[in-house]
Amino acid sequence: MAYSYTEKKRIRKSFAELPHVMDIPYLLAIQVDSYEQFLQENKKPKARENTGLQAAFSSIFPIESNSNNAELQFVEYYLGAPEFDERECISRGSTFAAPLRVKIRLVIKDKDSKDKNSKAAIKDIREQNVYMGEIPLMTDNGTFIINGTERVIVSQLHRSPGVFFDHDKGKSHSSGKVLYNARIIPYRGSWLDFEFDAKDLVFARIDRRRKLLGTIILRALGMDTNEILDTFFEKVSVYKGEEQFEIDLVADRLRGEMAQFDIVSPDGEVLVEQGKRINARRIRQIEQSGMKKLAVPDEYLYERILAEDIVVNDEVIAKANTLIDHELLVKLSAFEASESIKEFKILFTNDIDHGTYIADTLRADSTGSREEALIEIYKVMRPGEPPTIDTAEKLFESMFFNADRYDLSNVGRMKFNRRLGRTFENTDDPDIKREQSVLTKDDIIDVLKELINIRNGIGEVDDIDHLGNRRIRSVGEMAENQFRVGLVRVERAVKERLSSAESDNLSPQDLINSKPVAAAVKEFFGSSQLSQFMDQNNPLSEITHKRRISALGPGGLTRERAGFEVRDVHNTHYGRVCPIETPEGPNIGLINSLATFAKTNEFGFLETPYRKVVDGKVTDDIEYLSAIEEVGTVIAQADSELDENGVLAEEMVMVRSGGESVRMPSDKVTHMDVSPSQVVSVAASLIPFLEHDDANRALMGSNMQRQAVPTLRADKPLVGTGMERHVARDSGVCVIARRGGVIEDVDASRIVVRVNEDEMQAGEAGIDIYNLIKYTRSNQNTCINQRIIVNQGDEIAGGDILADGPSTDLGELALGQNMRVAFMPWNGYNFEDSILLSERVVKEDRFTTIHIQELTCVARDTKLGTEEITADIPNVGEAALSALDESGIVYIGAEVDAGDILVGKVTPKGETQLTPEEKLLRAIFGEKAADVKDTSLRVPTSTKGTVIDVQVFTRDGVEKDARAKSIEKSQLDNYRKDLKEELRIFEEAARSRISHLLDGQAISGGAGLKSGTVLAESELLEMSLETLLDIQPVEEEIAERLTQIQEFLVDKQKDIDTKFAEKKRKLTAGDDLAHGVQKIVKVYLAVKRRIQPGDKMAGRHGNKGVVSRIMPVEDMPYDENGNPVDIVLNPLGVPSRMNIGQVLETHLGMAAKGLGDKINGMIKAQAAVTELREFLDKIYNKVGGEQVDLDSLSDDDIRALAQNLRDGVPMGTAVFDGAREVQIDELLELAGYPSSGQQTLYDGRTGQKFDRPVTVGYMYMLKLNHLVDDKMHARSTGSYSLVTQQPLGGKAQFGGQRFGEMEVWALEAYGATYTLQEMLTVKSDDVEGRTRMYKNIVDGEQYMDPGMPESFNVLTKEIKSLGINIELKESN
């Protein structure tokens, strides 16, 4: 295989034995593709599909006026360019969005057109581009920048529209009878439910309102009794015989019934005795006997139901749906034969599979006509309003049959038709789509029929947790729905205005107010439950957040209502949703993560890829199947054995079929898994030896990797899974080359690439410039910084990684550090999962992290005047102002401590009453009262750091201070320098290109040279660019190329001038600040945090712990070579938790490190390249797994590779396809270690040997974002709650510890009276007492006199509010 520039620098040894069938798809596709479909930004307006914005517009427009004399038509929309780029938006706190302009056509019709039938003649057409607010744009990495913060819209898993059949599991009724129900769920509109009650009557509910009899809905659809009975029942004819009634005999209908009388054949043989059940054999006998009719006793007809009216001499004797009783039969027998009752029809019903439910419901239904039924429905939907036929009809029509109010959607119609066994054609014809989106009479009848079939025991209820019944709503679709909500509001307003459009001579812009649209979109992105503050701890947490799937949110579930079934793993999750990665706690199972290979299809259902299998031969054709399409397939596992022809080797194969794992013959197999890791999500697939970890611990491991803080120096995992490269690449934190070329110039903050000739477009200079992000704050206050990994002159290809981001190392995800660990108890310091750490780890800054805090100071307008940012602050000594400049803002580079002033600010204050002491002082010293108070921005408690950046934003129209101007100047200078450099590079590139072109060419003059001169490249390179451009070559083609280059340079100069002017305009213009804000100063503090006791650390297997002590290196256990271990872990943490993966990782890590040491030894001994090759070949190709083609690497590549392997040879043990025990043993032996993985250790304090060998190796440890510095907190005098006057709680409020009820009991039990008294009074809510105590301490007196606690006053006030007067009598 060919290795990329970064891959060949450090090749990860893979143990995978299964063939590589398919690349891992782009991990952010679910976000990026969805929003791309919504905007369709890169498509021409005419070529846009009817989705997203286009669909929203075309569903609302055209809007007709109420009087039909004018209409607004939608033509097309355009998105403008955003005003600020992504980085500017983040620093300014604005939204990264593009203006949306819509071309709207106003058509005014002629009312007075003579011909009444034809469409009104068009009188006037006005077209105009209307501004419709701003639409947030997605960044390349799938995020949105809203008000300066990066946010992610999480996809939602909701119930698919369609029809669902279910039952209550016997919980609704006391008898435990199972009651079935059907529910039609549209994409938007009213829900329609049908349900059985305990008496087997069918009821309907609309929008979960009061129950109605189901037949009322049928009557409202225009069906009468006979039509309803015809639709739902088969009929049986009853004939009047000589002595008995006879019925048509259809033998099949008797199956399973109990014979109520002897069934006798025409020749007198008893075929079925009374009381016997009629089975298949007896049915055959009846059919063979040739009987056509069956004589039945009268009792057989009792309780049967008449299918049609019985009419004699135009008089209705019995109505349809009447139960037959003795009286009726006597009446029928009494008629003479002449009076035409030779036969009548009854409904075919029985107790087994033809229930009488609809007939019984009809009998209970008092409405006799459509009108009555409509009014009944109206009463339920609008209780208390007087119904009229007209309004009732309109309401019913609009609920289910009006496309504006009801929309099943494409998905809903597909699911509906599939469930009822009909065909579904996907169409693009808007009219057919509109027809399909509403319900029809047949739809409702078919749903009822299916429900009755299920009640009769034919058919199954649906499983609502099946992924075929739940679909994904991604960003694009949710944004479209919000946009449509805004447009509907606009439509209402426009309709009223349209009528007067002609008379008032209005244009489309006057008619349309875009505020509601902008507000709806803004509300969705800003405050929807699914628009979340991005988790930006590290690249993995970003990717995982974007791939998250939530069942919560608008239109979804709520935590409280969700039961176990919804949260549980379902067999359709396989390859679609990860069974491991989900939060612990109340959201477990409601928030899931997309599996590695999963994607959504056009209907929003999750699909997973499989290889097709034809007659036992596994092909390389890949087919994506949704959970619906997967029904009926037989899927073999990815590790099924194949022979050399790709045919399944074993006769019986382990397969998944119908949701079960079973063995099946190989010729039955239809598909095969693509990869063993297709089951799990990205985070879970980063856990090596996942297959050896208990699922609960794997869940913790997946979740804790997301909390790892990027360390100062990223260190790739020695034991990985091979997935690290994909995550780092797709997360977007690395700089990736757009095109191949040569690195022209490189420094800490920028890379310049001279593009390859064949990748350039015509007439461009072929230079790509990449600016790096340096020390920027992330959402979680961690540090985002990109580091270059290329050198000048390197050749790179498009897609290569040029710079590492946070937590990446040579293009691989690196969340933690490889630590030398030993599993052994050590003086109780690893009790209860504590971790003992060596001081060496701190010294080498292995777990040192940088955190960046943003502190903001806002100067506002107040009632008493404007706040001022200044260095002149009252009553503050010189020392406190030493770090401020003349504008009152801290210098960059200042090291500050808690309480230091960062930005000096004074606020005007009103007149205050002076105390007698203050008056006296004023009189003596003659000092006038200062009319401002100090409200400066200070460093928060327990924070210490370095100022790394300051930004000043000034309101438009307010003069900028010196600091703002200097920041602006330096930004402009930097930008100018960048542009000049850019131009210089372009000119240099042009020079070398021209020299290359003119090399050996004859010239016809120019630049003071004689005609016919031939110049060599070396001479040309010494000439200036002006001279070169002056030369006129003989050859036409080359002259043409020179002209192109010259034109390009002129354009580039213009382009650079406009860029500079634009940047200057943006910088010098005032900022758009909130109302009443004059100035905002943002100060960024970088805090360096070393690891210390109390910090939380974890491995990747859910093995978490807290650092208990940091020991000197010399006291740590060491091995026979004197190498001390870095970390001592408790061996008791392994067996009960069943995460054995950590032990295997430790062993393999030891081997990896040992091999690195061997390579290091060879390099130090200056071994020949051939020797290195040989050893590398042993490592990569002799022990299991994938073959690495070392021959394709040059000697220099091999040397570079060996240099990078000195710290250890990285291993990739993929999920379910990883290293086996034998292979680990072989590598340990190759590295020169015992295959047991254990070593003899010595106590660092005494030098004595420990009793038995200890497992020592390398484990990848993470430092999690639960740092003791953020949690430690102590309170001095601080703020108090307003009502109770008690101290507030929590670190953020600088609060105290609550001394609760039980603590009071403890002190009572000890009889600690005075301690108790001060706890309940002066330390809590005795306002006067605490002031007096403060005063006493100032005066040097050591006593307290407690007063009345405020909570007592609160109590008396509450009692008074109940109308009981309570007074306090003070007695001496």
UniProtKB/Swiss-Prot annotation:
Matching InterPro entries: DNA-dir_RNA_pol_bsu_ext_1_sf, DNA-dir_RNA_pol_bsu_external_1, DNA-dir_RNA_pol_su2, DNA-dir_RNAP_su2_dom, DNA-dir_RNAP_su2_hyb_sf, RNA_pol_bsu_bac, RNA_pol_bsu_CS, RNA_pol_bsu_protrusion
The keyword Nucleotidyltransferase is assigned to this record: yes
Recorded GO CC terms: DNA-directed RNA polymerase complex
A GO term, aspect molecular function: ribonucleoside binding
Stored SUPFAM superfamilies: beta and beta-prime subunits of DNA dependent RNA-polymerase (SSF64484)
Keyword Transcription on entry: yes
Catalyzed reactions: RNA(n) + a ribonucleoside 5'-triphosphate = RNA(n+1) + diphosphate
EC numbers on record: 2.7.7.6
GO biological process, alphabetically ordered: DNA-templated transcription
Pfam entry (one): RNA_pol_Rpb2_2
Keywords linked to the UniProt accession: DNA-directed RNA polymerase, Nucleotidyltransferase, Transcription, Transferase
Region forming the signal peptide: none
Quaternary structure note: The RNAP catalytic core consists of 2 alpha, 1 beta, 1 beta' and 1 omega subunit. When a sigma factor is associated with the core the holoenzyme is formed, which can initiate transcription.
Function, in words: DNA-dependent RNA polymerase catalyzes the transcription of DNA into RNA using the four ribonucleoside triphosphates as substrates.
NCBIfam families, per database record: PRK00405.1, rpoB
Protein name (database record): DNA-directed RNA polymerase subunit beta
Lineage, top ranks: Bacteria, Pseudomonadati, Pseudomonadota, Gammaproteobacteria, Moraxellales
